[in-house]
Amino acid sequence: MIEIIISTIFILYILLTKYKYETLKVIRTLMKNYKEIPLQNITLSENNEVTVEDKRIKIVTITIHGNKHMVKYKFNNKLFTALLPCTESEYQFHITTKNGIDVTENVIKFMGPNYDFYGVKIKVNEIGYDSLMFHRPGKEPTILKSDDYLPNNLSDYQWDFSLVGLNQNISPPPVGEETASNTVEENTMENILKETKNLSQNILIQKKTSISGYKTLDVKRKFVKRKFVKRINLNYSFLILLN
């Protein structure tokens, strides 16, 4: 009987010790991951405006290679690396720790004007391309070559851009969504219009097209308020992996 009691105590000791060790290990991992999350100090100023203290995000470089992008940026005086694959997302980019913990919901609402585009250095490594064209509806596109720095007026730009070919004579496309069809080849537009007859007006239509020297883009047409609104993007959603 005594041997059974001693054996039981010994087994329980081993189990409890192991459980305790594993529990502490999990807690330490969670604490480590928590420290990696770029939390921002939000304060309320005298005029009731929410401000961010010393937590400005500064992009260092953007390197484009194939269908992926690599961004190095500084946050809170620490250097991070961002990997930007071609994936679709409800967000323009996702923020995750290197262990895969998604913290987008906690951080995305604080990024906005604190995401500093000024001074970003562009590096285009894709064969056959040497420039990027940044564009947003209602504004003239800005074309930057490799090793150029983004000007300050791009700080509020949507992250829609096209790769531009080497030694290409660039004539900026017309400004405004109603003239976007001028940049699309006629035969491609005819194909798109044929497809719209067979699909519901509320379904997005994706079709590959080529725009005079730019890389292949997706043309999406969505029925909104009884008219088609054309939107062109690269489906480059930003997935940020923190080091």
Swiss-Prot record:
Domain of life: Viruses
InterPro entries linked to this entry: DUF5772
Residues spanned by motif Bipartite nuclear localization signal: 207-224
One Pfam family recorded for the sequence: DUF5772
Descriptive protein name: Uncharacterized protein 373L
